[in-house]
Amino acid sequence: MQTSFHKFFLSMILAYSCCSLSGGGYAAEIMIPQGIYDGETLTVSFPYTVIGDPSGTTVFSAGELTLKNLDNSIAALPLSCFGNLLGSFTVLGRGHSLTFENIRTSTNGAALSDSANSGLFTIEGFKELSFSNCNSLLAVLPAATTNNGSQTPTTTSTPSNGTIYSKTDLLLLNNEKFSFYSNLVSGDGGAIDAKSLTVQGISKLCVFQENTAQADGGACQVVTSFSAMANEAPIAFIANVAGVRGGGIAAVQDGQQGVSSSTSTEDPVVSFSRNTAVEFDGNVARVGGGIYSYGNVAFLNNGKTLFLNNVASPVYIAAEQPTNGQASNTSDNYGDGGAIFCKNGAQAAGSNNSGSVSFDGEGVVFFSSNVAAGKGGAIYAKKLSVANCGPVQFLGNIANDGGAIYLGESGELSLSADYGDIIFDGNLKRTAKENAADVNGVTVSSQAISMGSGGKITTLRAKAGHQILFNDPIEMANGNNQPAQSSEPLKINDGEGYTGDIVFANGNSTLYQNVTIEQGRIVLREKAKLSVNSLSQTGGSLYMEAGSTLDFVTPQPPQQPPAANQLITLSNLHLSLSSLLANNAVTNPPTNPPAQDSHPAIIGSTTAGSVTISGPIFFEDLDDTAYDRYDWLGSNQKIDVLKLQLGTQPSANAPSDLTLGNEMPKYGYQGSWKLAWDPNTANNGPYTLKATWTKTGYNPGPERVASLVPNSLWGSILDIRSAHSAIQASVDGRSYCRGLWVSGVSNFFYHDRDALGQGYRYISGGYSLGANSYFGSSMFGLAFTEVFGRSKDYVVCRSNHHACIGSVYLSTKQALCGSYLFGDAFIRASYGFGNQHMKTSYTFAEESDVRWDNNCLVGEIGVGLPIVITPSKLYLNELRPFVQAEFSYADHESFTEEGDQARAFRSGHLMNLSVPVGVKFDRCSSTHPNKYSFMGAYICDAYRTISGTQTTLLSHQETWTTDAFHLARHGVIVRGSMYASLTSNIEVYGHGRYEYRDTSRGYGLSAGSKVRF
């Protein structure tokens, strides 16, 4: 194999010689061999290759090639495995694989290098490119010093950069798999060091893992731009380490020993666009744990963008480690940017975008558990923009300042929740405050965003159905370099369709800005505080929970008098009723004095600004529980709902009277509220708005009604009706003296929902068996039916039941009482006993279940007039008009649930008299022992009484009556049967029925067999 390898290099040299002599200006094309070349088994030195052609060189693969265990780190002239000195350099894979493993050298680019000053370096079309355990060590070069006129030979150490090194633009295009594992360089770019890097069209694997650079760019360093676009494979940077900047990626102007061929005056940038996924996990550097960039960092239309467990630590590598001649002020930001550090570099003329991190059109953005010893646990930048993204979350990031995000002086923040929520939660900063939480001996407090002096928020908005949730506060630095108070205000939810929520849920958020609510809501959760320069409303609403505060920012310096335009003007104020009741320790019956101090919402300051509230205020019960709490509103109450601190406003200008704007709820306790101000005029004291509640009654909500209990009586009646249908099917058919029959039965019934949302669906199935015997023209029979079923009310209740039914029936073909009008008659009676097992799945409490028994009695009588028809007419044998009467009675016993939401149910009953009138058609086959029967009838319920079920909610001692639904009085029913005699003694049959009434439908199917004797 070694022989063929040398032949390859000989042919390559000859090819270059020919190209040089021809002078035709054509790019050289060279084929590289296939095989495995292992330095541990080679008998001669590996022929390292350096090429160069001003017209460019294209190298293409002849097959799978692996180079491993090669070391020329101590050679007099250390080289890359493949190097280019002149012109563009293109490496074509042609669907093959190229692997570099355990390569060691002391020059730039242990595997591949391009030192040309112009052109492109392109690597394209490989099935797999793999670089693992490649080392570029310090190069020890000779130097000379003069000492008293004599020269003393000395050496100097120079760092080496990149497993792949390129002084020109590097393109990685359309490769299936691309991976760098555990590579190490003494300088920059543990995997790649290039002027610029473009990664595009990677289809299966693209990973940079556990690469290390002693200086910048644990995985990659560029001096103009890094771009990853249109990659189907996730782009992953995992556990890479940089001694100084950018554990994953470093985009710096002073890279490549400060001798880059780049002439650009703009800052280098980093961008990811249209990738399936981008992941930075566990990368470490002194500054910019995941990404360090002099210029902008942009994420555009990626499926997922994840930054996890990245760390910016100032002490990871000793300070004396070589830093490639970087500027000394790098240390100013040591520890900043746990995941991303975006430096506010030297801006190009006319540019104002430097230092910007942006997310636009992202599917998911997730920053979690990133750590910065300095500022910006997740992101350090001057500007941050999030727009047109799905869910965006910053969770559990930690920093000395700016738990999730730090924006420098005069920074700008733009957040727009367009297609998902933006959430900040569990982010921490170091603090010296007393009683702060302690984490591993360090006192911390929550913080989402920290902004340097002069910072401002330009956009804060959420589309309908979405929110921006600050479980951690925003803090703007105090300072004199704040935006002018006359500048454009921050417009909350500005733009069409932005009616979502901006939620401040915890801590003290400070905005040195004038704020205007355009639409949607600002929400202040319990004990959260928002301080602004001023706040007004042109639309939307302000929602406050108990203990929350809307205040003015403190003037800077503190001795400065308050600004004249520090105003809070509200026209649509909403207060959380449930939090007010909970935090005022409301009890039933009320205690005097109250069990604890009140905690109303607070607006205004005693030292600054003035407050105006106009229009009605609203009590909000978002989870619909406040009006259903016995301990809160089960009796008359008086609570503090709002404390208004008038600040510099004279006490004589009392607030105007307020009224309640919202209507009383339909469910729960019913009553009325009255609002009144309670002034404390001493020392310009606050006004307290007190609300007095007067109870008038109780109306249970849909979850408490339990309509399934009385409606189960209809289910018991339907069970017996299905048994009677099975009996009717067994009686019809060919005549016989005696017989046994068995039939499967099923029943399906649906009733539309009512105004309470209560519907009824009933499904049951079982079997019937019976015996018939004829006595002359009369037939007598007995039957037993067992049914299993389930039902639900379409709210929170569902029930399973089991019923047993006994039936007796008699039919005759003789006229009744000598009448000549009707030629046959029947009578049926059935009794059913059933057990119900109901479960109630509350949305606000644990599930409850209860059992009870139902009893049901149904009697039926009917008469008809058979009319025999000539077989040739209508293909019928018999036409039979009929009239029937059905009386039904059902009741349930009294019973009581267990648990906190227990209800007691009194017994109830239902009676119904139904009169069907219709006609039946029969046809018997003349050639086959078959029979067909069809019936259609009009139904009128002539009499009905429903007692309802008296229900008591034990915890509230409130009682109401729940009625069963009222079936429409009129309806139609159709039935059809088919019979087939298998032998002279065995007959099988099928039966179906359908009943329609306004708001309800029911149908049943059965199949059975008769044995005749």
Curated annotation (Swiss-Prot):
Subcellular location: Secreted, Cell wall; Cell outer membrane
Range of residues in the leader sequence: 1-27
Residue span(s) of domain Autotransporter: 733-1013
InterPro entries cross-referenced by the UniProt entry: Autotransporte_beta, Autotransporte_beta_dom_sf, Polymorphic_membr_middle, POMP_repeat
Pfam family, one: Autotransporter
Record's keyword annotation contains Nucleotidyltransferase: no
Gene3D superfamilies: Autotransporter beta-domain
Highest taxon listed in the record's lineage: Bacteria
Keywords assigned by UniProt, alphabetized: Cell outer membrane, Cell wall, Membrane, Secreted, Signal, Transmembrane, Transmembrane beta strand
One Gene Ontology cellular component annotation held by this UniProt entry: cell outer membrane
Record membrane topology: Peripheral membrane protein
Protein name (database record): Probable outer membrane protein PmpG
Source organism of this protein record: Chlamydia trachomatis serovar D (strain ATCC VR-885 / DSM 19411 / UW-3/Cx)
